[in-house]
Amino acid sequence: MGLLDILLGRTKPVAPDLDRLFGLPSAAVTLQAAAGFTPTGGGSVCFATVEGAAFDDVRKEVQALLDADAERTGAPVELVRDEYGYSWMVSRRGPEDLPALVGDLHAVNSALEASGFGPQLLCSVVGFEDVGGSESSGASEGSGGSGGSGGSARRLGLVYLYKRGTFYPFSPLPGGDGQRRDSSLELQVRAALADDLRIEQDLNRWFPVWGAPGL
């Protein structure tokens, strides 16, 4: 970063640091204590869809590696494509096995990065829920009213931005057209996890990952 960047207040982009994913298990303990959320056991890695044999080979190797885990229970690792054209590698573990889930996400990111597909990596998402359906304390974005979920489980994703090396919370609200988020809860989670994770400070980068698998 040069002198002109300093004078103009520009900041050097944060390099990807996949090891920050390993901070999620401790953050989950804080999150449960602060807001009542627990892991769902679902998580996923999002990347720009890539066609070609080279990518298919890497994907198959990663899936085979993760599915070979003797301790894995439930659905096998799968590749899905969302309505926006992005691809997601999805892993599902037991809710109590968050460290293993984080290991899966780290392995997927690392394999794609090592094979030259780092530029296609976008984010990783780990799902949480509050089955108690605690009422949110404020209005949600685009809802024009209370962020309460009417007694149903609240959902929350902790999103890791690969190119930023930062995390942010995303909480979609149930009902309606599925395009509302609980902004007040997201801000509450940001404050609660400030000492556990490197939180993305630019709120404009808190992109809504509607329909993210594993969330």
Language-model-detected regions and their locations in the chain:
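Conserved NTP-handling cores and scaffolds of large molecular machines
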Residues: 11, 66-70, 112
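N-terminal start-of-chain detector that recognizes signal peptides
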Residues: 15-20, 59-62, 95-98
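A glycine-rich, hydrophobic loop/mini-helix early in the fold
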Residues: 33-90, 94
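Compositionally biased, intrinsically disordered low-complexity segments enriched
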Residues: 133-152
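Core of folded catalytic or high-affinity ligand/protein-binding domains
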Residues: 72-131, 156-158
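Terminal interaction module
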Residues: 18, 116-133, 151-215
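Charge-rich, low-complexity segments
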Residues: 1-55, 181-215
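A short linear-motif detector with a strong N-terminal bias
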Residues: 22-27, 66-69, 101-105
